[in-house]
Amino acid sequence: MNIMKKIKEGPTVTMFVPYDCNNSCPFCVNKEEYRNSSSFDLDRCYRSLDLLDRIFPHNDVVFTGGEPLAELEALEDIIAHVGETHNLYINTTLPTSENQDIHRIAEVLNRHQDMISCVNVSRHLKHYVKECSDEIFDLLKVRHRINCVIFEDAKEPSTKEKLIKFLDRFNGHEVQIRANYSNLTLENVFETEGDDLFDLLCDIAEYQYPLEKELFR
């Protein structure tokens, strides 16, 4: 199936995979849940996805964590329970270990490129995680995007230079720069005045599109 032709109907559903990431990103809103993961298991994931497919056969599904790529074989089993009519997104740090290198990770993700709409890869100005080699991005055939959170350092003098180097590093790749979304509300999501991150981005890049509320309905 051509993933670009999939339609979306119904709410986006986020599934927290049953694997902790062993990281401590300060903006993570899920870490507290993984302090006790006794209620997480794969069978519950399967049942939830099967039920979801019956209720919302055309909605978006997001795998997040924790770390969805902590167990690649289990990830493939979970993907198999996502119906072909869904858009599937995976949030990951692309973790490597002695049991899985970048080639193994790329092999698994590429094998499911017809199912995966996008792999969202966490990379930040501050290194909160152990990052694998950037060579992996040349190995990935599946669509992928670099997600960078500017946490509380948008005002720091060094952030501008770091961000420019970051964008040069990932030149040619999709990059999403965002603030700590746990601070967003329906009231402030469209406010740009006094927004340190928005000011920083306007200082180094040309912003070409208006903030249209219609796009967020």
Model-found features: residue ranges?
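Radical SAM enzyme [4Fe-4S]-AdoMet core and its adjacent flexible, acidic
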Residues: 37, 124-217
